[in-house]
Amino acid sequence: MLEKTTLKNIILIHFLMFLAVVTAQTAPDEDTSAITRCTAEGTNPVRETDIPNPVNVGTIDDRSCYANYKESTVYGKTWGVYNITFDSNDFDTSLQPRIERSLSRSSETGIGSYARLTGVFRILEVGDTSGTSQDGTYLAQAKGKHTGGGGSPDPAICLYLAKPVYGTGEDADKQVSFDIYAERILYRGGEGDGREIVFLKNVKKDEETNFELEVGFKEDPNDVSKKIQYCNAVIGGDTFNWNIPEPERGTESGIRYGAYRVKGGRAQIRWANTTYQKVENVEVTNPGPIGDVYKLKNVATGQYLSDSGVSASAVIMSDSGEAQNNYWTFVESGSLFNIDNETFGILRAPGAGGPGGAYVVVSTTKEGPSSDGDKVWTIHYNESNDTYRFESGSSGRFMYQEINGNVTHISAMNTDDRSVWKAIAVESLSVDENAILASDVRVFPNPASDSFTISLKTINHVTVNIYDVLGNTIFKSEFNGDTIQIRNKGQFKAGVYLIQLTDKNNNKYHKKLIVK
């Protein structure tokens, strides 16, 4: 009798153990129904369909017609439920299905700016294509736009991809764990071969895994004049830090999470205890070489940037920086600058079909300030060696002296000295030597026609010389007083002229005049 009872107990224990194994393989909130493309419940008129007061942070982006976002309470937590199936994208049908939450982006690039997500995830199932490279589902992604074009208009920087690992024996057809990979760009806008996939770690099915993702900007420890854009993750206590390529092109830091991509089968991901924080620090930059007149010397060649003196013609380089057409000022235009020649107009940075050739920088007769997109520049200052790089707008292209002497604006690393310039103040015009200040002199109207007036604010005795672009003296006179009116009696033809004012201490100031 005892033997029979013992045998029954053994059988019962084995049966209970078997049930425990089955239960462990199926999560309490797992969807075990047949996989279909769409359901009536999951089909919505808009992507923003959500429940009131969801426990997960962020704005829903539901592009799946299989199921809606809902919530479950298991293991002492309330979980956001993200279920998607193959081909269930009812919006933007060329893209992959997803139910994700988008978090407001950190839109500043100053050191200390970041976006940070924390939470806990469980993975129950991911997309399966029978072991191909298309296996898996993204559970989170770092986002961020950049200057200079290339790739998607809203590119992913690093995606965290879960690929299925199948069991053995009776579990050979069951996903029992998941390999987590980082799919990250090799360069800005990288897609396809422009990305690498790096294994991070394995997590078990239905295992509660702590997750933290921070994307932001910090100081480069090797060069305090530069910064790093980073994407750092902590998954289940393991840290995976990565620096994003071309940090100078990054314009923001963002995060999305949920369930995204299923090229076969179904994906089920759960998120709980999500929090989000962002910090936005405005980038502090050198205001640029303003308030004086400069010669711009290319670091690689030692030559000086010169204006051609002809509108829509390519600028040139010269061995000497002493001619008037080598003198430049920087005119503020909002947060950007115009680069203004003392004898002609502001520089233009055309595109591939520019009048001087593809991306060749050309002269204009236009006065600054101008907000025209092809006439504004971002000034990048390197404090460590007192040099500048001039970026056309926010394009990621920099003023560059080519080997053939042409001056273009192209994508170039900051280590390429052909894109690096010295701004050398013209000594005779130095404010430190009591030169006439720019704010002390006005010329109006400018452009002029029949006459123009020179107004002097703090001085009352000057010699006025007016030159044409060839250096010929067109007008010369001495004046006492604070206002000088000059009539055009035919000596000023249509074109650009340089006004030179010299005070009694031999300080000089140059002002440009345009005659229509």
Swiss-Prot record:
Binding positions for Ca(2+) per the UniProt entry: 42, 44, 62, 64, 67-68
GO cellular component, one term: extracellular region
Propeptide: 430-516
Molecular function (Gene Ontology), one example: lyase activity
Highest taxon in the source lineage: Bacteria
Residue numbers spanned by region Ulvan-binding domain: 289-429
Predominant subcellular localization, coarse grouping: secreted
Top EC group: lyase
InterPro entries: Beta-tre_PLH30 (IPR057036), PL28 (IPR054591), Ricin_B-like_lectins (IPR035992), Secre_tail (IPR026444)
Temperature dependence as stated in the record: Optimum temperature is 29.5 degrees Celsius.
Disulfide bridge positions per record: 38-65
Localization in the cell: Secreted
Domain observations: The ulvan-binding domain binds strongly to ulvan, it does not bind other polymers like alginate, heparin, dextran sulfate or iota carrageenan. Presumably it serves to anchor the enzyme at the substrate, thus improving catalysis. Notably, the catalytic domain alone is more active than the full-length enzyme with the binding domain attached. Possibly, the ulvan-binding domain helps the enzyme to act on ulvan in its insoluble form embedded in the algal cell wall.
Summary of the function given for this chain in its UniProt record: Ulvan lyase involved in ulvan degradation. Ulvan is the main polysaccharide component of the Ulvales (green seaweed) cell wall. It is composed of disaccharide building blocks comprising 3-sulfated rhamnose (Rha3S) linked to D-glucuronic acid (GlcA), L-iduronic acid (IduA), or D-xylose (Xyl). Ulvan lyase catalyzes the endolytic cleavage of the glycosidic bond between Rha3S and the uronic acids GlcA or IduA, producing oligosaccharides that have unsaturated 4-deoxy-L-threo-hex-4-enopyranosiduronic acid (deltaUA) at the non-reducing end.
Family according to the record: Belongs to the polysaccharide lyase 28 family.
Protein name as annotated: Endo-acting ulvan lyase
Organism: Formosa agariphila (strain DSM 15362 / KCTC 12365 / LMG 23005 / KMM 3901 / M-2Alg 35-1)
